Amino acid sequence: MSGPNPPGREPDEPESEPVSDTGDERASGNHLPPVAGGGDKLPSDQTGETDAYSRAYSAPESEHVTGGPYVPADLRLYDYDDYEESSDLDDELAAPRWPWVVGVAAIIAAVALVVSVSLLVTRPHTSKLATGDTTSSAPPVQDEITTTKPAPPPPPPAPPPTTEIPTATETQTVTVTPPPPPPPATTTAPPPATTTTAAAPPPTTTTPTGPRQVTYSVTGTKAPGDIISVTYVDAAGRRRTQHNVYIPWSMTVTPISQSDVGSVEASSLFRVSKLNCSITTSDGTVLSSNSNDGPQTSC
């Protein structure tokens, strides 16, 4: 039973009614002994003394839990006549865009892979990429043309020297009278030997001419992201290819044959760059040029 209990029991409560079983006890022959010092007290008087200990705890009103005031529901929240359909359904029905993005990225990656493999396969002779300011020249196989000049003819033999033998003179003396002493004998000195030496011809000096150098040049405008390949003829007459070169590009070689001009070709991978080419010698002579501003040029 909840709630506070009154300090005393109500006389009308059935629990407070005294129960007297004296008739039964007497009939059964069982008599309870009287309590010492208790007198004749009824059971109801004995339970009243311990009633204060059996009361339930009653909380004060300040601790009672009370609900807030009643607020009726707003009927406008349940009005579906003015409900507008959300645009999220349209977004869900629209086709997603990410498959297109993934497809385009896959195509670009495949094209880049094919281009990279083709570049690695088609350059067996090139070991490094060319830079914009790098010019290299292959050493000539034959530096100069050597000519052997004939030895000068030996000088003619000198004629033998001419010597004259003096003739002996005999002097006869007469002992009749001592004549005056004879004059001293005169001896003729031999003329000096004449030696005729032929003048040697002046030596012929041959000045070797330096080998002619040929410069290949590629000019124009390179588009961003484009790959330009250049093919030229080296000093030995073999075709060389350089990939992904910078513009302007130049290469100087010394061909073995002085009559060989060589050739140079340049091409754009994506055909968006404008290229020109020229071939000039070391003295500035233009052997060939092409200024078509096209994605592919050759000289």
UniProtKB/Swiss-Prot annotation:
| The organism of origin for this protein | Mycobacterium tuberculosis (strain ATCC 25618 / H37Rv)
GO cellular component, alphabetical, reads: peptidoglycan-based cell wall; plasma membrane
UniProt key word Cytoplasm: no
Lineage summary: Bacteria, Bacillati, Actinomycetota, Actinomycetes, Mycobacteriales
Instruction: Write out the transmembrane intervals.
Output: 101-121
Q: Where is the composition biased (Low complexity)?
A: 164-176
Q: Where is this region: Disordered?
A: 1-72, 128-213
Cellular localization per UniProt: Cell membrane
Instruction: State the annotated membrane topology for this chain.
Output: Single-pass membrane protein
What this protein is called in its record is Probable transport accessory protein MmpS3
**Keywords of this entry:** Acetylation, Cell membrane, Membrane, Transmembrane, Transmembrane helix
Skewed-composition ranges (Pro residues): 150-163, 177-193
Residues annotated with N-acetylserine modification? S2
Family as reported in the entry's similarity comment: Belongs to the MmpS family.
Q: Which residues form the signal peptide?
A: none
Which Pfam family name is an example for this entry?
Answer: Mycobact_memb
List, alphabetically, the InterPro entries matched. MmpS, MmpS_C
Biased composition, class Polar residues, residue ranges = 128-139
